[in-house]
Amino acid sequence: MAYITKRGNSYSVRYTYEDEHGKSCDKWESFPTKEEATNRKKQIEHELAAGTFLIPSSVTVAEFLMDWLPKQCSKHKWAPKTYESNLSTIQNLIIPYIGSMEMQKLKPYHMENLYTTLSKTPCGSYIEGKKQELTEKQKQRFLSGTTIHEVHRLLGTAFQYAVEWGILVKSPVPVDSPKKSTQERTIWTVEEMRAALDSMEDPILHLAVHLTLVGALREGEIVGLTPEDLDFDAADGIGTFRINKSMQRVRKEALNQVDDGCIIKVFPDKLERSTTSLILKSTKTASSCRTIFMTSALKEELKKWLNQLAADEMKDPARYHDSGMLFRLPNGLAVEPVLIRKKFLKWQDAHPEFPRIVFHGLRHSSATYQLMISGGDVKAVQGTTGHATADMLVNTYAHIQQSSRVELGKKFESGFYAKPDTPSPQAVPAAGEPTISMTALLELLKNADPEVKAQLRLALLT
């Protein structure tokens, strides 16, 4: 039951409710007119009778999210990077803008205003929740639609829990999500991949890129390899390497929050008071665990690399720190993913004739090339790339090469404009050229067994 009391020039509604602990509490709400107070009284009595009454709460968005995050991490057994990524989104993209607002005062238009603000916000404006001083150049790079979509996704999930926990009656997050960015990734052609590999003199970079091009690996998977993952005699001597681990550098705060079941090893800190740790963890999904065929050139390079590791250890055994990893510095310490990226950036600066791509673009290039030479055998390529679903592979890596579009245009012209009783014009092969058609060749490749496909990659990459 609710009561109205006139207090000076305003009207107060007093009512009693039970909090989350079952304790009886009195609440007063003030209104400027009797009509508003009467409407609120009726609303309260209806909600109390229907069991839909929302317990008053002054908890802020920041307080709720920082309470919700570790609970979700524990419930869903997040990997350290997942926790770190979500924490970063909350600290840098949500709390600075709506963190001080009370949850129960949030409306859908507040969410829309947040998305609009973020779309005009430069990247890196906040790091670990602290405002950053940006250069004029940095101020011109704004958050992408994909990043804002991720904010929407996180808030949508979090606020649904707020409804379940009785903090909100309804989530204020709009149903329509911000549009993701659709910028096409830059990739290399096979000629560019081969030429780039030939020009790389740094042994660590050369091996890392070679492995990526053959196996479409992620950065963490490359440096997560150990010598035990190599089998030079497998597949009738073709040789294979196994992907089942990944190396990452994560914040210690994230490491302390997650279930350590997926963590294989935490490497010793190089610096005192370090706020991050280098870890070796199992791959994120079952499909990420896979075996990849070697090429003969890669096989020989790996053997030479193992000999170099043994030689490095013999130079000064007392000061050698055997990390147990395949990628090591001359002193035995593990090579981190960031070092591979830095080496690749340095190489790109020295070779401006190649299209500028991020290191992960090599994985895209390899996957796209393998889709082409396999005649679109998505399942075979999926076994190499480790994508969870075939759709994910196709949607992410089905780049259209310019040469393929030109060939498609020629085929359309020869087929579309040909008269019904006139055979389509055929290109006349030059002397010494094979006469097998592209269609027949792709069909042969599609139906070939994995060993033949591995040998084909060997021929193309050597």
Regions found by a protein language model. Give the residues of each.
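Short, basic (Lys/Arg/His-rich) helix/loop patches that form interaction surfaces
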Residues: C123-I127, D198, D202-P203, G215, ...
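N-terminal core-binding DNA-recognition domain of tyrosine site-specific recombinases/integrases
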Residues: Y3, Y17, P70-Y161, T182, ...
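Short, polar N-cap/turn motifs at the start of nucleic acid-interacting alpha helices
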Residues: D229-G237, G375-A398, S424
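Catalytic-site neighborhood detector that most strongly recognizes the C-terminal catalytic loop/helix
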Residues: K179-K180, I187, K245-R249, T385-K411
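N-terminal DNA-binding module of tyrosine recombinases/phage integrases
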Residues: R7-E112, E128, A310-D322, Q402, ...
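C-terminal catalytic core of Y-nucleophile DNA break-rejoin enzymes
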Residues: R242, V250-R273, L280-K304, H321-F344
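C-terminal secondary-structure termini that scaffold catalytic or DNA-interacting sites
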Residues: F232-A235, K245-C289, K410-T462
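Basic, Lys/Arg- and aromatic-enriched nucleic-acid-binding interface segment
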Residues: I127-G145, H149-V151, E164, L168-P227, ...
